[in-house]
């Protein structure tokens, strides 16, 4: 998980890892996080956010915040996603997360998203190959999950605490009936089919 960082750290470069959570759901924001770990940090997490349980993610979240030189986050809501499309919204969130770092970095490693205007290394499965990127994936996922738990209290019928806005069977059934909320992405199928 450190091959790319070690090579960059040996050159004296500070690495920022960036990843997002929430590109695929039908509802809710896309959240990005950027993390800069001290050079030569040994791996201290079991993997990226997808490989951890909720409890493990929350524990890792606290550990990352304690170990990192800097952590930046950004949230882009569903209205912006509908206006600019999910890829542009993801890049916008990532760039805002980098700006939120308020810390110098030399290169950015992403999970296969090229960020224009940045010295960027987009890696296929970057969240599995880069420790900084894996840490960013955990931060983004924990924050997005907390946001969706708040939305669950506002829209309990959609069970956002469980499905996090992803198209579960019951969530899809509600959408197929024409039911949706303010946080649903109207530009995403099947909502787009129902609305236009």
From Swiss-Prot:
Enzyme class, broadest EC rank: hydrolase
PROSITE patterns noted in UniProt: RNASE_H_2 (PS51975)
Keyword Manganese (UniProt): yes
Residues in RNase H type-2 domain copies: 13-196
NCBIfam families in UniProt: PRK00015.1-3 (NF000595)
PANTHER family: RIBONUCLEASE H2 SUBUNIT A, RIBONUCLEASE HII
Official protein name in the record: Ribonuclease HII
Organism: Aquifex aeolicus (strain VF5)
Classification of source organism: Bacteria, Pseudomonadati, Aquificota, Aquificia, Aquificales
